[in-house]
Swiss-Prot record:
UniProt subcellular location: Cytoplasm
GO CC, alphabetical: cytosol
Binding annotation for S-adenosyl-L-methionine: 78, 83, 129-130, 148
Gene3D superfamilies in alphabetical order: Vaccinia Virus protein VP39
Species assigned in the record: Streptococcus pyogenes serotype M5 (strain Manfredo)
Family classification: Belongs to the methyltransferase superfamily. RNA methyltransferase RsmG family.
Pfam families: GidB (PF02527)
Signal peptide (from-to): none
Entry EC no(s): 2.1.1.-
InterPro entries: rRNA_ssu_MeTfrase_G, SAM-dependent_MTases_sf
Listed name of the protein: Ribosomal RNA small subunit methyltransferase G
Function text: Specifically methylates the N7 position of a guanine in 16S rRNA.
Record field: transmembrane: none
Length: 237
């Protein structure tokens, strides 16, 4: 998917990018490739692949109608090089985006990236989701939490649901169907008062299958969740 293919496909979906937005995606690509030689951000660095498998893939929840261009508070867990939240932010500038990442070098990249792209209302924090999930400044504060290929739902639910407001939504982007994952996550979702409200499949323009699972938070998360850093992965609920 060339940049021109990307613009044209978005236009067909009803999103006509401004010259500023096109420049932002171009700068994003160039900085991603430049910084990838210093720190491991992605295995995908070829321009057409980045536009398809990072940029287009990241904005899929918008294209599929699951997000609006409103000043909602969105948290991205395990965003790595900023996916999916920063391509979403370029497309929908009204989003207020927060990223938590456990690697300080990635936070340095994201901070520079946001400055170079001229993004406002973006916040980056270095640390573990399990620790921030017990911090009152973060816990129960977000309308949406996104996670792209971060962990299985059984683990992911504990890392994300505590951050949501009641009726807030987890949007999980997956490369594989999540049926088995959701079966395994039933207990975790029950304990965390999360309910799967949508399982959506779609295709990238090249025909690759992708999946979005949306979980809504129904009640306050019990205080003991999330557990200490590392435990959700070692001993899933």
């Amino acid at each position: 998917m060339t940049p021109q293919d990307f613009y044209r496909t978005l236009e067909e979906d009803g999103f006509s990018l401004s010259s500023k937005q096109k420049e932002q995606f171009d700068t994003y690509f160039k900085l991603l490739v430049e910084w990838n030689t210093k720190i491991n951000l992605t295995a995908i660095t070829e321009e057409n692949e980045v536009y398809l498998k990072h940029f287009y893939d990241s904005i899929a929840p918008i294209l599929q109608g699951f997000l609006a261009n409103e000043p909602i508070k969105l948290l991205d867990i395990g965003a790595g090089a900023g996916f999916p939240s920063l391509p979403m932010k370029i497309l929908f500038p009204n989003l207020e985006v927060t990223i938590i990442d456990s690697l300080n070098k990635r936070i340095s990249f994201l901070t520079l990236l946001a400055q170079e792209l001229g993004l406002e209302n973006v916040h980056f924090f270095h640390g573990r989701a399990e620790d921030f999930g017990q911090d009152k400044a973060f816990r129960g504060q977000f309308d949406v939490v996104t996670a792209r290929a971060v962990a299985r739902m059984q683990v992911l639910s504990e890392l994300t649901i505590p951050f949501l407001k009641i009726r807030g939504k987890l949007i999980a982007l997956k490369a594989q169907a999540a049926d088995q994952e959701l079966e395994e996550a039933k207990n975790a979702l029950c304990l965390l008062f999360g309910k799967v409200i949508k399982n959506h499949s779609y295709q990238l323009p090249n025909g690759d299958s992708r999946f979005i699972t949306i979980v809504e938070k129904k009640k306050e998360t019990p205080n003991k969740y999330p557990r200490k850093a590392g435990l959700p992965n070692k001993k899933p609920l």
